[in-house]
């Protein structure tokens, strides 16, 4: 029974190893170059920066980006469901409808709370 999950396990192990290698190699070969203050300063096309380059963003930008990611995730679930719609039964159909209903409730809640208003 566990043999059918072997390709998924192998994929996860290989992905983990590649990720760890890609994270570890720069630490092995990088030199400590943070001793120069010029490397830590902001750079704007050869000029001294006019203002602070590390300014804060309004929280609404983060909220809109999170909402975009949530609804982008919805689309990634939507495509496989639409492709396999003729092969799934009513349980698959109503599962997706429940998923869309929960997302719609979340969207309406965010809209009512004023998360999408730019005043």
UniProtKB/Swiss-Prot annotation:
Gene3D superfamilies reported for this sequence: NADH:ubiquinone/plastoquinone oxidoreductase, chain 3
Membrane topology: Multi-pass membrane protein
Catalytic activity, as annotated: a ubiquinone + NADH + 5 H(+)(in) = a ubiquinol + NAD(+) + 4 H(+)(out)
Segments passing through the bilayer: 8-28, 63-83, 88-108
Subcellular location: Mitochondrion membrane
Alphabetical UniProt keywords: Electron transport, Membrane, Mitochondrion, NAD, Respiratory chain, Translocase, Transmembrane, Transmembrane helix, Transport, Ubiquinone
Source superkingdom: Eukaryota
GO terms for MF: NADH dehydrogenase (ubiquinone) activity
GO CC terms of this entry: mitochondrial membrane; NADH dehydrogenase complex
Signal peptide as annotated in the record: none
Record EC number: 7.1.1.2
InterPro entries: NAD(P)H_OxRDtase_bac/plastid (IPR023043), NADH_UbQ/plastoQ_OxRdtase_su3 (IPR000440), NDAH_ubi_oxred_su3_sf (IPR038430)
Assembly: Complex I is composed of at least 49 different subunits.
Miscellaneous field: A stretch of 270 kb of the mitochondrial genome is duplicated within the centromere of chromosome 2 resulting in the duplication of the gene. The expression of this duplicated gene (At2g07751) is not demonstrated. It is also probably not RNA edited and therefore differs in all the positions known to be edited.
Purpose: Core subunit of the mitochondrial membrane respiratory chain NADH dehydrogenase (Complex I) that is believed to belong to the minimal assembly required for catalysis. Complex I functions in the transfer of electrons from NADH to the respiratory chain. The immediate electron acceptor for the enzyme is believed to be ubiquinone.
PANTHER family from the UniProt entry: NADH-UBIQUINONE OXIDOREDUCTASE CHAIN 3
HAMAP family from the UniProt entry: NDH1_NuoA
Family: Belongs to the complex I subunit 3 family.
Name listed for the protein in its UniProt record: NADH-ubiquinone oxidoreductase chain 3
Phylogenetic lineage: Eukaryota, Viridiplantae, Streptophyta, Embryophyta, Tracheophyta
Gene behind this protein: ND3
